[in-house]
Amino acid sequence: MSSNNVPASRRKCVGVKVGSVMIGGGAPIVVQSMTNTDTADEVSTTQQVAQLALAGSELVRITVNSMEAARAVAGIRARLDDMGCHVPLVGDFHFNGHKLLTAYPECARALAKYRINPGNVGHGRKRDEQFSLLIETACKYDKPVRIGVNWGSLDPEMLARIMDENARSPDPLGASQVMHKALITSALESAARAEELGLARDHIVLSCKVSGVARQQDMIAVYGALAEQCDYALHLGLTEAGMGSKGIVASTAALAVLLFKGIGDTIRVSLTPEPGGDRAREVIVAQEILQTMGLRAFVPLVAACPGCGRTTSTYFQELAESIQIYVREQMVIWREQYEGVENMSLAVMGCVVNGPGESKHADIGISLPGSGETPVAPVFVDGQKTVTLKGDNIAGEFRMIVDEYVRTKYRKKAANA
């Protein structure tokens, strides 16, 4: 680790190309998401994929669980391309993937990657045959595969073998350690078998999903051991994290530790949406984790104080929220026009105690008056006080300052870039 508060250098691994996106191999950590629509409904699935891509998802996974879903995949891909949305699609297969990919070659071709779970491909000889069919299809169409092992669906024969070996050991492992070993063994043995069947090493991504919000330590231990034992690209995600703040905290607690150690090449935050909630929330949370850790930049960061007895007005909170929404909306335009604008930092502070100092540390900062203070708001640009705002249109004037800063500070991209 380079210092006590800087993430370690990234773990070296083999890069895997998924459509136009590189996972691992030194590439930036990839944000991905998954739809919750019925894939057989081409229109609604296309719309949600496009929404997730617009929010910043660089890969989008869709369920392929039936003949109807498999038949719809090529149409979804065509609809997205017609919209100018070229985000790679990942097919999520369980139980019957070997049948669907074989029966619907247009589905196999349209997907950029296949996700398979070795725990539910089948059992015994059937497992071997069906796993082979999946891998042979991937080889035929030159598609990468994520071999995703899940805590809740481990191959029972493999698990029984490991438990028997442990029982005969003079120094047996505890129950959790046995499960850790089973997850890792399943992933590595499946990857080795895939390579034997002809799937190149640079076409394999691994994941070991641990279930439940109280299992972060298990996830950290499993991925730490897996990272030491192989050089495959790794997908991180805490399955069944839950909804709301609990889901966000559970995912962040596990992902942040691993990312800090340099482990992880692509991430998904598996949030359960609130009723009527926005599916794209999981994309934004994943981006915020990476950006807060200094691993990637997606949108300008808006810092704001939490408020206290000095900040009796709620205006600074309203301004902070409106600016945060504004810059995220504007990034749709800015990222196409300006280089590096995602690195811009803003500060909206609520009183004189920390306001001026914190504002000076941001690219653009505003210090709003607290309780009993003169009703004026100094603005700092690149550490220097440039103007003092007052009146009823502070928010509008501050947005104009932000716009002007973007236009003058960041270089315009070439027209054909």
UniProtKB/Swiss-Prot annotation:
Pathway membership, UniProt: Isoprenoid biosynthesis; isopentenyl diphosphate biosynthesis via DXP pathway; isopentenyl diphosphate from 1-deoxy-D-xylulose 5-phosphate: step 5/6
GO molecular function: 4 iron, 4 sulfur cluster binding; 4-hydroxy-3-methylbut-2-en-1-yl diphosphate synthase activity (ferredoxin); 4-hydroxy-3-methylbut-2-enyl-diphosphate synthase activity (flavodoxin); iron ion binding
Pfam families attached to this UniProt entry: GcpE
Cofactor note: Binds 1 [4Fe-4S] cluster.
Keyword Metal-binding part of the UniProt annotation: yes
Protein family according to the UniProt entry: Belongs to the IspG family.
Official protein name in the record: 4-hydroxy-3-methylbut-2-en-1-yl diphosphate synthase (flavodoxin)
Organism the protein comes from: Nitrosomonas europaea (strain ATCC 19718 / CIP 103999 / KCTC 2705 / NBRC 14298)
